[in-house]
Amino acid sequence: MATKQRKVTQKKSRRKVQRGVVHILATFNNTLVTISDRSGLVIASSSAGACGFRGARKGTPFAAQTASEEAVRKALDYGLKYVDVMVKGPGAGREMAIRALQQLGLGVTLIRDVTPLPHNGCRPPKKRRV
């Protein structure tokens, strides 16, 4: 029986990305942080749930900060230096996630709120009676 010859291939090199976009989705229940390059290819992502927070703790500002730090640490391997920040949602973790980006040494060049606002579109759900 013939033995298989293995091909020796080079490891795919990591592409260098200096400028990127950070998308922060802050809901009342969780915070998601996604870092991509300018064309939209995702480099790194994290969420409060992926960082080990469960239940009501996922919606806290500290959980958002932890998720943001973890995503930035992954993205720094690609040589990321400057980012535009797009924030969506009404959650508690909006400001803390942006602050965590700045603390880890990323240059924030732009902060834009991209929360969708209806121009009186769909009828909202009925009011809660507690």
UniProtKB/Swiss-Prot annotation:
Disulfide bonds: none annotated. It is found in: Plastid, Chloroplast. One of its GO terms (biological process) is translation. InterPro entries: Ribosomal_uS11, Ribosomal_uS11_bac-type, Ribosomal_uS11_CS, Ribosomal_uS11_sf. GO terms for cellular component: chloroplast; ribonucleoprotein complex; ribosome. Pfam families: Ribosomal_S11. Keywords: Chloroplast, Plastid, Ribonucleoprotein, Ribosomal protein, RNA-binding, rRNA-binding. GO terms for molecular function: rRNA binding; structural constituent of ribosome. The keyword NAD does not apply. Gene3D superfamilies: Ribosomal protein S11. Part of the 30S ribosomal subunit. PANTHER family: 40S RIBOSOMAL PROTEIN S14/30S RIBOSOMAL PROTEIN S11 (PTHR11759). Belongs to the universal ribosomal protein uS11 family. This is Small ribosomal subunit protein uS11c. The lineage of its organism: Eukaryota, Viridiplantae, Chlorophyta, Mamiellophyceae, Mamiellales. The gene is rps11.
